[in-house]
């Protein structure tokens, strides 16, 4: 993971298990973030539990998203969950997130391609996509997810 980021990867999307300071598989933690030397900051989409819990830790004991943002060779922006997220529910949110940014991500859904690509807006769109979706069907997990994923970064950052 670190090699891909150091090579200038534009976007890293991770979907597996996460904890406050790491991704599980492949394992990548705050320690590895500290070792990054890339000059082209990446965009991180972390569809994992707890990686965006800014209330975690004290002082230099950052959560995963915070470490990516604070490290000078880390990320330009991060989307991450502040608490435990739910499989399938977070997948549906991610589908909407990426369909907003790249309209052909889900070719049978929507047809309005837009000229501007704001990841902060994609965060809201992913939640709207989840709400209107008939799947997954457990509304309590959907309700929790609306307040779970946060965009950390410049709200008007555009992807070109």
Regions found by a protein language model. Give the residues of each.
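Catalytic-core segments of thiol-dependent peptidases
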Residues: 1-58
